[in-house]
């Protein structure tokens, strides 16, 4: 994860452009080789992708909630890939502004640092939603106020918000 969420606003445009270029290449190939079924299939796939990506987007928010070790990260990674959502990870964003130095590791878990991390996640979720991309936020969300902030964000945009709660037996945690 590069952390370049601001680039999401242009991503759809460039994916559509690239799909149309690939569709054109496939069309030219089929023109030169009319019996090339693979070229026809490639054209259909790329052009279809471009059409789907120009349709109005329906973003939403999924909050992955639960204790550390309950499976949130594994599930959210798989779900994000499956549904084409942007996944925001509290673990990744928590470590991003600080050196990966043992002396500073405990500073990442103060109440202030945790609140700042949720504020950053919310800002990144706003940026992601501005780009009309669905977003999955992978964090413990143990405090009601942290969940409420994202629920308010979704409500303010009239988009759905879902909370996926993860549980695990104590020996697993």
Label each PLM-derived region with a short phrase:
Residues 2-54:
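Helix-rich C-terminal or lid/interface subdomains of diverse kinases
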Residues 57-62, 131-133:
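Pre-Walker A (Motif I) flank of P-loop NTPase domains
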Residues 62-64, 90:
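Hydrophobic anchor at the beta1->P-loop junction of P-loop NTPases
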Residues 156-173:
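Conserved phosphate-donor/acceptor-positioning beta-strand/loop module used by diverse small-molecule
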């Amino acid at each position: 994860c590069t952390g370049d969420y601001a680039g999401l606003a242009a991503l759809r445009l460039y994916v559509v452009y690239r799909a149309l270029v690939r569709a054109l290449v496939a069309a030219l190939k089929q023109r030169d080789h009319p019996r090339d079924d693979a070229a026809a299939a490639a054209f259909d796939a790329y052009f279809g992708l471009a059409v789907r990506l120009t349709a109005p987007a329906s973003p939403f928010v999924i909050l992955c909630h639960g204790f550390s070790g309950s499976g949130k990260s594994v599930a959210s990674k798989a779900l994000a890939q499956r549904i084409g959502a942007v996944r925001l990870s509290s673990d990744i964003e928590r470590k991003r502004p600080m050196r990966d130095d043992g002396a500073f590791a405990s500073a990442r878990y103060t109440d202030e640092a945790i609140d700042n991390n949720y504020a950053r996640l919310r800002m990144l979720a706003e940026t992601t939603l501005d780009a009309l991309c669905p977003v999955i936020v992978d964090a413990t969300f143990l405090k009601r106020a942290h969940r409420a902030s994202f629920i308010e964000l979704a409500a303010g945009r009239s988009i759905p918000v879902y909370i996926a709660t993860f549980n695990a037996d104590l020996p697993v945690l």
